[in-house]
Structures are given as C-alpha cells and as structure tokens.
Amino acid sequence: MSQAIVVAALYKFVTLEDYVELREPLLKTMLDNNVKGTLLLAQEGINGTVSGTREGIDGLLAWLRSDPRLVDIDHKESYCDEQPFYRTKVKLKKEIVTLGVPGVDPNKAVGTYVEPKDWNALISDPEVLLIDTRNDYEVAIGTFKGAIDPKTETFREFPEYIKANFDPSKHKKVAMFCTGGIRCEKASSYMLGEGFESVYHLKGGILKYFEEVPQEESLWDGDCFVFDNRVTVRHDLSEGEYDQCHACRHPINAQERASEHYSPGVSCPHCWDSLSEKTRRSAIDRQKQIELAKARNLPHPIGYYYKAEA
C-alpha cells in the first residue's frame, strides 16, 4: 500500500513483574521513533495501538522484541494517509484488557488458537457456538455471519452474560473473536475456568482475518470498529465511512450525520437527549478549539480519541 502511516495494533499476555520500570524506557523509545498512540502495561502484559512511519514502527517493534519476553509479541498492521493519533502515552494498569474477574490468567491457560485460514471451517460447523466478545456499538457495525451478540456495553459484563446464558454441559464447542485477539484470548481463559471444555478463539482477531483471508471468501458482514480516528475499517483494511461522536463515542454513519440531532463534536442521535448541560457545554467549547486549530492548520491534541480495546 502507498499510505505513509503504519497503524500497528499489538499485545501479548506475559508476566511483566517490572512493568512499572518498563514505562519510561518504552515511552522514550516511542518518542525517539516519533510513534504516536497509547500502550498499556500491566503485570499481565502489554496492549495498545500505535502509529508512525514504517521506520518508526519497525524501531519500536525491534526495541520490544529485544526483550526475550516480547520476542513473539502479536501485532497487526494497516495503513492510512494521516496520523490517527496526536499523543504518545504509556499507561500503567491492573489489566491490559479489563474483565474484572480475579484469578483469570491467560498466561496460565487459554483456549485453542485458530488461524484465520481455518476460521471459516470452524464457524461453519453447526455444533459450534460463535460469540462476539466485543461491545454492542462495535457489533452493530459489523460481525461474522451467525455470531451471537452479547449486547454488552463493556467487557466487564461478559462474565455475567456467559453465566446467565450458557451451560458448559450443553455448549460443548465455543468459538470467540474480537478486534485484535486480546479480548477473546482473555475470555477463553475465563471460560475454561468456568468448565467449558472446547474453547476456540480467532488468532490475531478480526484484523488478522481481514489481512489473510481473501474478501471473496470472507464470512464477515459490515465494517470493523477500530480504536483510533479512522473509526472503522473495511475488509481490505481501508478506512470506512463512519465518524465518531465525540460526546458519547458512538460510531455514526452518513444517515445519522444527516439527523437534526447531530451536531459535530457535540451530540448525535444516540446521545442528544441524554447529555447533561455540563457535558454539552464542554463539548461545544472543545469543538470550537478543534475548528480553530483546523483553521490554523495545527494538530489538535484533544480532537481525537483513543481507547485500548476494552
């Protein structure tokens, strides 16, 4: 591809006892390589999405892989014409993806990884229960044909959804997927602990499936939400047509942008009647700053939103 900016989603579950000490050298490496975005560090591993030039991303990956614990860190790439991030951050967390269930440790037990080339065959098996582990607003944009939508607002709700709806003695084969592989990997560890026997998850997530499976063979329907300013990507990993409401963070399509309830940066049909006056005023002020920065051809550091896959 000819686009100048490389967007790299990366993660690995691995015990990092020194994760606090890793923060500063990791941040310095990102800054030295002019890499933008946010990486999360916790005792259970590393997670995040970053962007930069080819040389910059390669420099960061080389530094990470110089640590024997991260030599095989999982990463997926896509491309765009402009920087999707304006800030460079390394944050310390309790979990690199928040499930909120003590004792769930993907470093000790996870389900069976399924390569993208084998995924279609698995999910076409009528005995396989296919679960989308992502949040409701992500599923609404696109998902695999036949997948169950848990309708969760956060990953923290996933355990209760499983307990309320599925029985290990009845549901013998379970396959799960997520954007980059991290949520479904942690979900598989949780489900094994709950007694589910045959648990599968898509290695590298939806993004790796897009990367490796030809579009004409795809069982995916729609776009895929991504955690940067592109908002969504298509199967060919090109930027989708969605924008994102900066007030409620909900993806919005062309029809929703045409709504009388849509005001750029302030509200959309999903939130216009639920915003507090304080939030609305803050959004209006923020949008004015963004527009002023654009008029001056300057980047606006709070004009874009990043959140690690959660």
UniProtKB/Swiss-Prot annotation:
One of its GO terms (biological process) is tRNA modification. InterPro entries: Rhodanese-like_dom (IPR001763), Rhodanese-like_dom_sf (IPR036873), TrhO (IPR020936), TRHO_N (IPR040503). It comes from the Bacteria. Signal peptide: none annotated. This is tRNA uridine(34) hydroxylase. It comes from Pseudomonas putida (strain ATCC 47054 / DSM 6125 / CFBP 8728 / NCIMB 11950 / KT2440). Residues 124-218 form the Rhodanese domain. It catalyses: uridine(34) in tRNA + AH2 + O2 = 5-hydroxyuridine(34) in tRNA + A + H2O. Pfam families: Rhodanese, UPF0176_N. The active site is at 178 (cysteine persulfide intermediate). Belongs to the TrhO family. Its EC number is 1.14.-.-. The gene is trhO. Catalyzes oxygen-dependent 5-hydroxyuridine (ho5U) modification at position 34 in tRNAs. GO terms for molecular function: oxidoreductase activity, acting on paired donors, with incorporation or reduction of molecular oxygen.
